[in-house]
Amino acid sequence: MVFGEFFHRPGQDEELVNLNVGGFKQSVDQSTLLRFPHTRLGKLLTCHSEEAILELCDDYSVADKEYYFDRNPFLFRYVLNFYYTGKLHVMEELCVFSFCQEIEYWGINELFIDSCCSSRYQERKEESHDKDWDQKSNDVSTDSSFEESSLFEKELEKFDELRFGQLRKKIWIRMENPAYCLSAKLIAISSLSVVLASIVAMCVHSMSEFQNEDGEVDDPVLEGVEIACIAWFTGELAIRLVAAPSQKKFWKNPLNIIDFVSIIPFYATLAVDTKEEESEDIENMGKVVQILRLMRIFRILKLARHSVGLRSLGATLRHSYHEVGLLLLFLSVGISIFSVLIYSVEKDEHKSSLTSIPICWWWATISMTTVGYGDTHPVTLAGKIIASTCIICGILVVALPITIIFNKFSKYYQKQKDMEVDQCSEDPPEKCHELPYFNIRDVYAQQVHAFITSLSSIGIVVSDPDSTDASSVEDNEDAYNTASLENCTGK
């Protein structure tokens, strides 16, 4: 008998409802079920046709007036106890998810769980949710790693059908997998060094010490570094493109698109500078050149090819669009509310710079994100109170989705690290040798042939097998052992 269960004995004049739940039969008063008319059994009593009854139960016997449900009879005892007592009780040995699904089927809300069981029930449910999420994340990580390994092997198989397949295969592996060998590591280090040098050169370009009066770079060293970096990026992209097993899949890789975008500004700027235009278009062409030069900042994204953290960040943002959208929604609502409030109390102050709602939007944005530039600030007491509330709300609003995003980032980062460890621990594809093949019959024939040859060499000839005595058998065994030892020594 489950906790709190007791069987109600109806009087003779009371009409009963016959229930059959997975073989467990029970007769219940109609008045007991009608206490909760929004549950499945309560709705069952209000049905006026057999079709409506069969929508709520699995079968119905007109002769016996029995309703059949293909459900767990053990869990139904807890449901039946709820109709008698008005409270749900959850035993420790029950699965919380199974119990939750069962009461959801019967139309019973979790709010009916008694106070003695509700706290523990919610704790177990949250623990199960966390474990289930971790398990799914691990399964996804394992499946993704397996799929990526399978795709890598399939890509290697394609080289056998291509022209210069073996050469392209060696180049492609060294360009894509820095952990493959020493030369692959040197290529990765060189590429990373060139990216960093290009970023440093781009920053130095903006310094006035290296520019002439027209704002152009007037330093041959910086120009040489820029040309050398672009030559490296172009050559690297061309080699990857030529060695790739599939040109279509090559351009679907975001990292390859970043490589292509990083070199476009240089060649576009070069084409614009060499093109002769009329005086009217010089100003417009200059603006285009400036924009193209600013696009060189995309080179910094090339670091994602060599950085586990950047790749994990990209995967996290790609799979956390819901949380990021929720964060932007919270901030937008808060900015709209506090900008109007601060404008209403600061607009009449002459010393205040918060004289329009767009300016108040800017102030609310930097306040809710806890940046606080200090260029605009309230001067009235009411404005300072609103500002304090805005900052506190900003901390709370930003902190809510950030935790979820951080957990996902940790998962993807660990996944990327595990994949790198797997790549380093596995033998390179070219170094994997097949297991040696042995034919037992051939090996046995060779051993017998060597044994007969050794017998002939020491003068032992067996003419008649029936005349063989014990001493000859012992001699044969000694000879066999000697021959086997010589054969093993020779090998």
From Swiss-Prot:
Topological domain ranges for the Extracellular compartment: 205-220, 276-285, 344-357, 378-384
Location (main, coarse): membrane
InterPro entries per the UniProt record, alphabetical: BTB/POZ_dom, Ion_trans_dom, K_chnl_volt-dep_Kv, K_chnl_volt-dep_Kv5/Kv9, SKP1/BTB/POZ_sf, T1-type_BTB, VG_K_chnl, Volt_channel_dom_sf
Intramembrane segments: 358-369, 370-377
Spans through the membrane: 183-204, 221-243, 255-275, 286-306, 322-343, 385-413
Cellular compartments annotated: Cell membrane
GO cellular component, one term: cytosol
One Pfam family cited in the UniProt record for this chain: Ion_trans
Residue positions of motif Selectivity filter: 370-375
Signal peptide (residue range): none
Notes concerning its domains: The transmembrane segment S4 functions as a voltage-sensor and is characterized by a series of positively charged amino acids at every third position. Channel opening and closing is effected by a conformation change that affects the position and orientation of the voltage-sensor paddle formed by S3 and S4 within the membrane. A transmembrane electric field that is positive inside would push the positively charged S4 segment outwards, thereby opening the pore, while a field that is negative inside would pull the S4 segment inwards and close the pore.
Family classification: Belongs to the potassium channel family. S (TC 1.A.1.2) subfamily. Kv9.3/KCNS3 sub-subfamily.
Protein name stated in the entry: Delayed-rectifier potassium channel regulatory subunit KCNS3
Native source species: Mus musculus (Mouse)
